[in-house]
Amino acid sequence: MAVETSHDAELTWSLVLPVKPLARAKTRMAEAAGPLRQALALAVAADTVAAALRCAAVAEVIVVTDDPLAAAELSALGARVVPDEPDCGLNPALAHGAALARAARPRAGVGAMSADLPALRPAELGRALAAAAGFAESFVADAQGVGTTLYAVRPGVPFSPAFGPGSRARHAAQGARELAIEGLDSLRRDVDTPGDLRAALALGTGPRTAALAARMPAFSPGAETSRG
């Protein structure tokens, strides 16, 4: 079971976000996005990072990526960009970013968050992090109830992310507390498929994602109806 801790309303957080090389990102969007697929992947990541940086509880956003274009744009937004080490998968990359975060801010909590949350609201992220401050290890499930969009640990707690297919069950099995809080729709709405993006657009995405989607016929008003 998750260990409940004394609640620290003043706890700040370092967030680690992984960003794939754009050439390999959003492949399930290839048909809908066409030649704008890579630009869409970058827009989604940029809107996610920008929203996270506006959250008052977030002291730092660390982006783990080897993509030079993504690195330049996300660094310009204010994120700290580090290379993907040891370059052997998602969870090791997150652990690398978390180690750097703890070296810089040992008294901050550390979270790993999806970079695919273009509708993210800073206030919703803040509510989740405030709840996470009350537990040693916690997570937020995705909108499908199968994956994870946020995994968080308090200072000094081992950082053991288990992202990937079925991560909700894995995080729960290792003792992390699921933060089943109402009103976290934007934090739970990750985007991997055209249907996911339509759901995010309905919530209201950041400006970069909205602008790219407006250029794609698949996401124009009435497109869903026209497919019958």
Swiss-Prot record:
The protein's enzyme class: transferase
Q: In which pathway does it act?
A: Cofactor biosynthesis; coenzyme F420 biosynthesis
Stored InterPro entries: CofC, Nucleotide-diphossugar_trans
Where phosphoenolpyruvate binds, per the record, is at T148, G164, S167
What EC number(s) is this enzyme filed under? 2.7.7.105
GO terms assigned for molecular function: GTP binding; phospholactate guanylyltransferase activity
For this UniProt record, the keywords arranged alphabetically read as follows: GTP-binding, Nucleotide-binding, Nucleotidyltransferase, Transferase
Q: Function of this protein? A: Guanylyltransferase that catalyzes the activation of phosphoenolpyruvate (PEP) as enolpyruvoyl-2-diphospho-5'-guanosine, via the condensation of PEP with GTP. It is involved in the biosynthesis of coenzyme F420, a hydride carrier cofactor.
Q: Which protein are we looking at?
A: Phosphoenolpyruvate guanylyltransferase
